[in-house]
């Protein structure tokens, strides 16, 4: 998997950018708030069909503009693919248009055209944050490698919203309980499909992450386990109906899943040091890259956003070793110091300032 070229127009702080990328290591240097993260985000959007950091898609549109455009040429499996992702805003309405080789595609069908693993400082929330961060991690990985996962997830969310709406109407005496039957059945069916995909992925991810973690930490044991919904979700939905009616929301299902992360048998979120948590995150992200490659047959593009400065020498060395082994890598940093000179000699190095990408020096 290789990103050949990237074009941005009115995207965040990039008024216009046309960029050719090298096949291996691409390094972008620059001070904070110059556009380094925005650049990596644009590639992640092509992999996920949505931003992993924007609260609203309208946030992607640059100042004094009505739309934002991301275009790319990608080489994958011996073929070249042209991708286009446009976000536009008219009045209060935001829309997006996605094209693959000029043909319109739905957002849920874009993931898989580009495989990428994004690693940035906020990923520490994978360990120390709430369950929603770990569910997002699983979803962002699975939409890239499990055909139809994105569609199933989108449908599950719509059915869940409908069920929660009905719960409120039933509690208010505006609907009968029998109106839930069809939605409960579909929620259980979709939820089972999501849970199965997540459980299989974690079973494959766990040994990869454990091996990486042991190598970086000097022998610590990283354990992953899936805290998913009950096997018979339909029965649980019926049994917990009274509680759901009181709360006006659905209490069981994969929207409540979690990924348990333990180090030497102890919960990493509650008891691990920050250094141990960072090691776990590095191990998880590298394992994600390995899993995407094993499932898709394509080595994903590795996106590293100013993370080297956040790591101590041992973890930095482990990550840089993987950078040397990886396919295409796009990495940002405030300065070149964290990179070995031998690695920099092989890299395409450019500087970013105020939304402009130029040669350094």
Segments (PLM) and residue ranges:
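Conserved NTPase motor "head" modules and their coupling/switch loops across ABC/AAA+ ATPases, GTPases
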Residues: 1-31, 45, 174-301, 310-314, ...
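Hydrophobic "anchor" residues on beta-strands that sit immediately upstream
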Residues: 18, 97, 116, 301-302
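Conserved lysine of the Walker
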Residues: 36
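Nucleotide-state sensing region of NTPase/ATPase domains
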Residues: 47-133, 137, 142-149, 203-211, ...
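Structural recognition of the conserved hydrophobic beta-strand(s) that form the central parallel beta-sheet
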Residues: 72, 328-335
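Long, charged N-terminal accessory/stalk domains
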Residues: 125-126, 132-181, 185
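Walker B catalytic acidic pair
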Residues: 305-307
